[in-house]
């Protein structure tokens, strides 16, 4: 029995899809515990590149059952477009299951999200405009639509009517937009009901019974620690808890059943959208990391902001999540750059901070304190063991491990599934 959580340790785009793809072939279930189609991940299988958004990467595994958990928000149009796109390429998504308690994104959620961002102007958060935040807001306000509501049209209509009593006031009186018709929303949801119903399960019961029977579960977190609504760079965050604790809540698997918490972290740092980023680069090295690392968002097509490795964030993420292991990705991108700066602390208005500053104001004022290490020139993309890495690459990895306070058990040396050095396999305990 293994219950493994995969969590992004930075601001997303760390390579969680690759980690999940590698581990997904060794487990019985792969579950997405949070988020929606607002964050994408890329998986390379057999030389084929797949860009997934709402679906767990485990959908590409031949054996694992992929599940969208109760902590997710599901845009049905996006879900079935993604399924159809995969199946058109020969993939089999028939094993996919959806928690009956997952929240559904309604057309009015998307409308409110987009108009609200435009309304904020320069103060905009930089959301993807896919209705994720408004859907989570309705969830905690207890007026959300759940997947199980599609099983009873009368309940579905009643909930939509109740929600639109409020939403139309917002759209018409605040944002000067037209009111949303109840029948249109009901018809929208019912158009997907027949396809969705066979997928619905009591995910919490099924997953816990699977663990009782000695089976293995992998929880694939979306977004990342620094985008967590409680622990991230608020307000420039997502609307859920993409951390270890959030994975437990988003699946119904209790924390005492977790056998490994695997943090995914790049050998440098990236971020998409607005918000503070102490090690961000605006020179040729930022452009180099962006170009060489292929740093363009899967979901938005936006170029990612790039910077050097930030060990303050790495230590913080280790503590917040209780990581047992790190999966270091994109080490190959740093080949041949001469010297590699590592942020070991911050200077905040003349005061050294070895840990995350307490306030966001301080974090906005943080400037990195660097130490440098020599880079390597050798091609590492075919290295299969840690010992095969050049000595300078080994030294860099060891230093990151020391600074993060967590062992590095996997090292990505290229985009392919087989371009991964495995030091300690968490799927095997």
Swiss-Prot record:
Enzyme Commission numbers on file: 6.3.4.4
Key words, A-Z: Cytoplasm, GTP-binding, Ligase, Magnesium, Metal-binding, Nucleotide-binding, Purine biosynthesis
Cofactor binding note: Binds 1 Mg(2+) ion per subunit.
Domain of life: Bacteria
Cellular compartments annotated: Cytoplasm
Chief site of localization: cytoplasm
UniProt-listed InterPro entries: Adenylosuccin_syn_GTP-bd (IPR018220), Adenylosuccin_syn_Lys_AS (IPR033128), Adenylosuccinate_synth_dom1 (IPR042109), Adenylosuccinate_synth_dom2 (IPR042110), Adenylosuccinate_synth_dom3 (IPR042111), Adenylosuccinate_synthetase (IPR001114), P-loop_NTPase (IPR027417)
Positions of the catalytic residues: 13 (proton acceptor), 41 (proton donor)
Signal peptide residues on this chain, from the entry's feature table: none
Pathway participation: Purine metabolism; AMP biosynthesis via de novo pathway; AMP from IMP: step 1/2
Cofactor(s) required, per the database record: Mg(2+)
Pfam families: Adenylsucc_synt
Record-linked Gene3D superfamilies: Adenylosuccinate Synthetase, subunit A, domain 1, Adenylosuccinate Synthetase, subunit A, domain 2, Adenylosuccinate Synthetase, subunit A, domain 3
Sequence positions that bind GTP: 12-18, 40-42, 304, 330-332, 412-414
Family per similarity comment: Belongs to the adenylosuccinate synthetase family.
PANTHER family the UniProt entry points to: ADENYLOSUCCINATE SYNTHETASE
Quaternary state and interactors: Homodimer.
Protein name in UniProt: Adenylosuccinate synthetase
């Amino acid at each position: 029995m293994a219950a493994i959580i995969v969590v992004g340790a930075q601001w997303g785009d760390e390579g969680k899809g690759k980690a999940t793809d590698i581990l997904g072939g060794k487990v019985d279930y792969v579950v997405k515990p949070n988020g929606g189609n607002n964050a994408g991940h890329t998986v390379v299988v057999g030389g084929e590149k797949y860009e997934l958004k709402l679906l767990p990467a485990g959908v590409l595994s031949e054996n694992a059952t992929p599940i969208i958990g109760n902590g997710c928000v599901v845009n049905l149009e996006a879900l079935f477009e993604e399924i159809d796109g995969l199946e058109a390429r020969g993939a089999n998504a028939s094993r996919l299951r959806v928690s009956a308690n997952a929240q559904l994104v309604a057309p009015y959620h998307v409308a409110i999200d987009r108009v609200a961002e435009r309304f904020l102007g320069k103060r905009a958060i930089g959301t993807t405009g896919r209705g994720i935040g408004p859907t989570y807001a309705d969830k905690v306000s207890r007026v959300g639509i759940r997947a199980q509501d599609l099983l009873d049209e009368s309940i579905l209509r009643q909930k939509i009517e109740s929600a639109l009593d409020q939403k139309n006031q917002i759209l018409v009186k605040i944002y000067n937009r037209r009111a949303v018709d109840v029948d249109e929303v009901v018809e929208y949801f019912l158009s997907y009901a027949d396809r969705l119903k066979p997928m619905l399960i009591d995910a919490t019961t099924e997953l816990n019974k699977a663990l009782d029977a000695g089976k293995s579960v992998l929880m694939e977190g979306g977004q990342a620690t620094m985008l967590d609504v409680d622990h991230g760079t608020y307000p420039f965050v997502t609307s859920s808890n993409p951390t270890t604790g959030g994975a437990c809540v988003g699946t119904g698997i209790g924390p005492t059943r977790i056998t490994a918490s695997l943090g995914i972290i790049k050998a440098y740092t990236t971020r998409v959208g607005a918000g503070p980023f102490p090690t961000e680069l605006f020179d040729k090295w930022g452009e180099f990391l962006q170009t060489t690392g292929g740093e363009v968002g899967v979901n938005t097509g936006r170029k990612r902001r790039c910077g050097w490795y930030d060990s303050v964030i790495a230590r913080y993420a280790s503590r917040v999540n209780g990581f047992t292991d790190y999966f270091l990705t994109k080490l190959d991108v740093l080949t041949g750059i001469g010297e590699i700066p590592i942020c070991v602390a911050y200077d905040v208005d003349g005061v050294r901070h070895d840990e995350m500053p307490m306030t966001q104001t301080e974090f906005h004022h943080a400037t990195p304190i660097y130490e440098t290490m020599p880079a390597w020139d050798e091609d590492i993309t075919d290295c299969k063991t840690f010992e095969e890495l050049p000595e300078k690459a080994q030294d860099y990895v060891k230093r990151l491990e020391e600074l993060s306070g967590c062992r590095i058990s996997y090292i990505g040396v290229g985009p392919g599934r087989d371009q991964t050095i495995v030091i300690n396999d968490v799927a095997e305990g």
